[in-house]
Amino acid sequence: MSLKITSITLDDFRGYDHLVIDDLGNLVVIVGPNAVGKTNIIEAIQLLTAGSSFRKPPWSETISWGRQQGYARLDLEEGKRRVEHRVVLSGNERSYEVNGKKKTPSALRGSLPCVLFTPDDLQLVKASSSKRRDAIDALAVQLSPNYPTLRSEYQQALRQRNLLIKDGIHSGSLFDSWDESHAVHGARLCLARWRLFDRLFSRMTTIYEGIAPDEQLDARYIPSWERASDERRQRGDITQYEQPDAVHEMTLEDIQDRLLEQSRELSDAELRRGISLVGPHKDEMAFFINGKNARLFASQGQQRTIVLVLKLASVELVNEIMGTEPVLLLDDVMSELDERHRAALTAFIEKNAQTFITTTNLDYFSDDILDHATVVRVPIEGTRYDY
């Protein structure tokens, strides 16, 4: 069994004065016209499960206009077990409680992880490599309590290294010290992200085959030392990308050595550009369909299939690693998917995690699905401020 959300309470959160949605089942469909606060409910759930918001707002913006504080609460159940997640937003700060005891965002994440799917995610395949790294990192911080530390320690070393490079320094004891720190923390972050991507992709292939059996999906995790130039990244055939060493064969020391070696090789280029050109902030994750780079050659439908499969595989991987089903948050994606992809998505959610879906149109769902769903129609009279 896994924790399930049974009710949501919002007070002075975004545009909501007071909202309570309870008696929630395994599938919750939130339906209503645009700009009535559907996405705000999804954001609140993410804030109370992942400890973050995909909107990345200043926290003051989540508080209703003219109010000093905002408040959101989830009630969760697992059999006879009851859990309450609460966040209080005040100014640019937020504080969490679980069953009345103060918790950090990282401590909150272990109770009920979430997987979020928004229309912006559908651009993930052709977006910049930083977006794909962010997507994997967002999953990783929920799977490992140590991952945020890995990332922050690397970012600190990277900032210091960049400051020295901007000052024209690429040698000497001070630079060598931060270069070593950059390699040590970079190796840890790279290996953790690479291993997660490897496990995620192994699940993606099975799901993809069920949706597009006539196509072969491949992927490459391309660490920074394998990305020799932008020209190489433009190549569309998978055979033109050297197969990196299998992740299970790489050690931290191997990656450290590669990063330090690349640092020496790129010293002139880094001094010219004033930034670090090596490290996990430059790693790439590329997908291929029938051997061709999906970013360059796949149709929009094929690219969206990859993203859909990545999200569904994330749900399965969370369940495998944490032993609990995450809550799946789908914000207005049904309108962006064709009938085949909607069918694949609804077939998945019928037998998997608790799911919250926002939509403007119930016609995207079969009568059978709606018969088993909790349908919440918004706006609900008296719950929102009339600005």
Q: Where in the sequence are the language-model features?
A:
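Conserved NTPase motor "head" modules and their coupling/switch loops across ABC/AAA+ ATPases, GTPases
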Residues: 1-33, 173-184, 188-327, 336-340, ...
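Conserved lysine of the Walker
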Residues: 38
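Helix-to-loop junction immediately C-terminal to a conserved catalytic motif
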Residues: 46
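Nucleotide-state sensing region of NTPase/ATPase domains
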Residues: 49-131, 135-147, 202-206, 262-264, ...
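Structural recognition of the conserved hydrophobic beta-strand(s) that form the central parallel beta-sheet
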Residues: 74, 354-360
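A conserved P-loop NTPase coupling/switch region
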Residues: 102-111, 118-184, 223-225, 385
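Walker B catalytic acidic pair
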Residues: 331-333
